[in-house]
Amino acid sequence: MPFSTRRHAGPAGRSRHTRRIAVSAALLFVVLLFPHLLPNSPGRLGSLAETVLPWFGVLIPVLLLWALMRGSPLGVAATLAPLVAWCCLFVPVLTGAPRAAHAEFKALTFNVGGERTTPEEIAREVIATGADLVALEKVPVPDMARYKKALAGTYKHHATDNTLGLWSRYALRDVEPMDLGGRWPHAIRAVAATPGGDTAVYAVRLPSVRVRVNEGFTIGRRDEAATELADRVAGDRSARVMVLGDLNGSLDDRGLAPLARHLSPAQAAAGRGFGFTWPAAFPVVRIDHVLLRGLEPTSTSVLPDLGSDHRPVLTGLRRAA
């Protein structure tokens, strides 16, 4: 009698697959709605999951296809839970109409790291945006003089330190480099004489993060710097505060929660979509931010790839009502 090792699908097999699909769907539902329940040890996986949270949605069609291939109506029904959760979280982000209002001035943040263009080319692109305040991060130190020269005709005022630069059409005073506990300045604070009153502007680049097999999500130094920056912002007596820069993280990441408690993201109020900025060729996460206190964003947008590994963010602003 011939013997076959092939498994035949039957009620028992379908039931087993249904249970697996249902458990997977339940776990995905919990991760989407309650990512803060994921522990950050080992490897700070909780923060990593929060950083890429919208992308968990790609697992939903995978579960649905699995259920359909196994002929499991209950499995199909189980996938509805994470689908509804994802839609509740992110459909409003994707479909919300950005506000349209007159801007008193515009601000741009741009991590210019990368070797696909020149300081002069970037300067031309920056000037063409019409921005009044420009924060540039990761400026190669040998190129800083070229940036200053290329931007000088449009921006009469500037403050630079290490790889950070702040350029302005408005007068700057009280310039202060801030190391935030690191070996090099992670921020520059300056008071800009913006329309409607002074604004304390922070040009920021927090420490870089990596995902490594032996270490996990390496956000320790970034989180420490973010907490230090949040403390500085909380103690800033200026009525209007703006943080421009590369925070090397999503605001959904619990590591940036101290900043989110004191400042409001322009993207949430005046943007459309996720506003991903990195990597420039195919952005998958928003790590470049405009955070505000005492200012109202009238518009905000992620600009096209200008030759860096990040995309710039341009935001229109006016005094808060």
Q: What feature does the model see in each segment?
A:
Residues 113-127, 138-321:
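Soluble catalytic domains of enzymes that build or remodel membrane lipids, polysaccharides, and related
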Residues 2-148, 321:
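N-terminal, active-site-proximal structural segment of metallo-dependent hydrolase catalytic domains
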